[in-house]
C-alpha cells in the first residue's frame, strides 16, 4: 500500500467512534501522526468518557502509528484552540484538519426547544468554525513567515443540509452552513496554501441508528447484505485522498460518499430565469404564472429517499 501521508500531522474531531474513528485509523495507516479528539459524549451531546479517544489512540499505536488523545469540546472556542495546539505541541505542526464531530437532537420544528437548536448548531457549525479558525491562524502565520504551507481541511456536511430532511431543521441548517463555510474559507485560504473541501457521508453510525431509530432497521439490514455499502470504513479513503498532496488544486468542493459511490455536489445555482420586456419592476399579481412556469422548467430535486433506495440497490447488488 502506498502511504500518502508520510510526515503529515492530522487532527480529527469526534474521532472516538464511527466515521471519525475510521478516518483517524486510515490517516495513521497512511503515515500521519494523529490527534484523536473526542470527549466521549452521547449522541445527543451529554456526558464525557475519555476512554473513547484513548482506545483509538491505543489501536493506532498497536499498528505502529503515532497518536495522542484530546478530550476538549469543539464548541468551546478555547477548547478548540487546545485541540489544534495539541498537534503543534506534540508533533510540531498541523497539516490536516478533519472536522467530523457531531451530535443529533432530532425534533419537528414545533417540538424543538431552544437548547436543541443551540447545541446542535454549536457542535456542528460553531465547532467547525472554531477548529478551522485556530488552524488557519497557524497556517497564515507560517505562510507570512515564509515557511511552506500545504494545509488540508476536510469538513463534514450532510444530505440533511444539502437536500433537507424532516425532523432535522437544526442539524440540516448546521450542515448547510458548513457547506457554504467550506466554499468561502477555500477562497480565503487559497493564497496561503490551504485547501478546504467537505464530504457528505452516509454510513452506519450511532447517529444513524441510535439517534434515528426509523433508519436503524434499514441500516442494519445492509450490514448483512452481500456488500456492506454503509460500513463507516468506506468513508475514510476519500478523506485520506483529500488530505494528501495528490489532491492539490482541489478546493471548495463538496463530495457525497456512500460505500463505493462518490458524487460531486453542485450546490445552489440558477435553473430558470425570466426578465420583463420593459424596464420596470414586477407587479405582485403577474408573478403567479411566471413563478409557476419557472418551477416547471427546473430539474427535479434529489431526495434523501432516492439516495437511500440507490444505496439499498447497491448493497443487494
Each PLM stretch: what is its role?
Residues 3-36:
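Canonical Rossmann dinucleotide-binding motif of NAD(H)/NADP(H)-dependent dehydrogenases/reductases
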Residues 50, 54, 71-84, 114:
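The beta1-alpha1 cofactor-binding region of Rossmann-like NAD(H)/NADP(H)-dependent oxidoreductases
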Residues 63-66, 79, 86-99, 105, ...:
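A glycine-rich helix->loop->beta "capping" turn
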Residues 108-109, 116-121:
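Substrate-binding pocket helix/loop in short-chain dehydrogenase/reductase
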Residues 132, 174:
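Active-site helix of classical SDR
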Residues 220-316:
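C-terminal helical subdomain
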Amino acid at each position: 500500500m502506498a502511504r500518502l501521508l508520510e510526515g503529515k500531522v492530522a487532527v480529527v474531531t469526534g474521532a472516538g467512534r464511527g466515521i471519525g474513528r475510521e478516518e483517524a485509523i486510515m490517516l495513521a495507516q497512511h503515515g500521519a501522526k494523529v490527534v484523536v479528539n473526542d470527549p466521549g459524549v452521547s449522541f445527543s451531546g451529554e456526558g464525557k468518557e475519555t476512554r473513547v479517544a484513548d482506545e483509538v489512540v491505543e489501536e493506532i499505536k498497536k499498528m505502529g502509528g503515532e497518536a495522542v488523545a484530546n478530550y476538549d469540546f469543539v464548541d468551546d472556542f478555547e477548547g478548540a484552540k487546545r485541540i489544534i495546539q495539541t498537534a503543534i505541541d506534540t508533533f510540531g505542526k498541523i497539516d490536516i484538519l478533519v472536522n467530523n464531530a457531531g451530535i443529533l437532537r432530532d425534533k419537528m420544528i414545533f417540538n424543538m426547544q431552544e437548547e436543541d437548536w443551540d447545541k446542535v448548531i454549536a457542535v456542528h457549525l460553531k465547532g467547525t468554525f472554531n477548529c478551522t479558525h485556530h488552524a488557519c491562524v497557524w497556517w497564515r502565520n507560517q505562510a507570512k513567515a515564509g515557511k511552506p504551507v500545504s494545509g488540508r481541511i476536510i469538513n463534514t456536511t450532510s444530505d440533511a443540509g444539502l437536500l433537507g430532511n424532516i425532523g432535522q431543521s437544526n442539524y440540516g441548517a448546521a450542515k448547510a452552513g458548513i457547506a457554504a463555510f467550506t466554499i468561502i474559507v477555500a477562497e480565503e485560504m487559497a493564497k496561503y496554501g490551504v485547501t478546504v473541501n467537505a464530504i457528505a457521508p452516509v454510513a452506519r453510525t450511532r447517529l444513524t441508528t441510535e439517534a434515528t431509530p426509523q433508519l436503524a432497521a434499514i441500516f442494519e439490514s445492509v450490514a448483512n447484505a452481500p456488500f456492506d455499502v454503509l460500513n463507516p470504513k468506506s468513508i475514510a479513503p476519500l478523506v485520506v485522498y483529500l488530505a494528501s498532496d495528490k489532491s492539490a488544486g482541489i478546493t471548495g468542493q463538496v463530495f457525497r460518499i456512500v460505500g463505493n459511490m462518490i458524487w460531486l455536489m453542485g450546490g445552489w445555482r440558477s435553473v430558470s430565469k425570466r426578465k420583463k420586456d420593459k424596464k420596470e419592476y414586477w407587479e405582485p399579481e403577474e408573478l403567479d404564472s411566471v413563478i409557476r412556469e419557472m418551477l416547471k422548467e427546473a430539474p427535479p430535486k434529489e431526495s434523501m429517499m432516492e439516495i437511500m433506495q440507490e444505496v439499498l440497490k447497491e448493497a443487494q447488488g
